[in-house]
Amino acid sequence: MKTQILALSVALATAGPAMAQPVNQQDLQTLTYADLADLGAGAPVVAHVRVRGAERLNAREATTVRPGFTRFEIEAEVAALIRGTGGLPERIRYLVDLPNDSRGRPPRIARRSEYLIMATRVPSRADEVRLVTADAQVAYSAAAADMLRGIVREASGADAAPRITGIGRAFSVPGNLPGESETQFFLQTADQRPISLTVLRRPGEQVRWSVALGEIVDDSAGPPQPNTLLWYRLACTLPARLPADVLSEATPEETQAIQADYRVVMDGLGRCARTRAPRR
């Protein structure tokens, strides 16, 4: 494959062939919903690609590569476009950083190996894309592709759950009966759309909590389903403990109730499991 200058690199020269060990790619069976949502929820381009050629860049051409990684220029054919307004050419090029093996040797990328990539477009270069992170390429599987399609479909909807930026305020109000209460948490979002969490306690009933997207709180609503975009926004963003400023105006009794109900929400959401550290 002929090496050309890419928008991600400066003055690429002819790169050496990709020899050494086969790629030690992360097993797709271990990738979680959060892993794929980290990469794909906001990516303008999501595609299933098949490698036509790979060239390894030397240290002079890849000065920003993390220790223990090697940068490659990939030429690939587009097998399927999952997201990408305006489409893509049949063949594209991009740069990717891949981990070296335990002996420090660069990986080998097999011709016709298949991947899922999450990327942005390169201005004025129709056949080039830039990965959203230097390693935003994962081995293809039908299960991972289906999960990504679901993430993209939800993220592209007009009613998509917004990105959460913090917790604005919280309050708890006791009911008329002993043990009865209602606690609400008002979340801050990137696009200023309201999200609120409500926890209801009633004597003799199981504690219930729900999430509302909008101004109207529906007591009959429930918590988000796991492995959905709304679940991801909450489980992978909300802090494990309430920030002190959220409780600054609460009485000691209210603070105790609010903290207990916040634990109900966090326990209900469960852990945001990741196998890779999100890179921004």
Can you describe what each PLM-predicted range is?
Residues 1-6:
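Bacterial N-terminal signal peptides that target proteins for export
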Residues 11-13:
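Repetitive helical segments and hydrophobic/amphipathic motifs
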Residues 19-280:
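Transition segments tied to proteolytic processing and entry into folded domains
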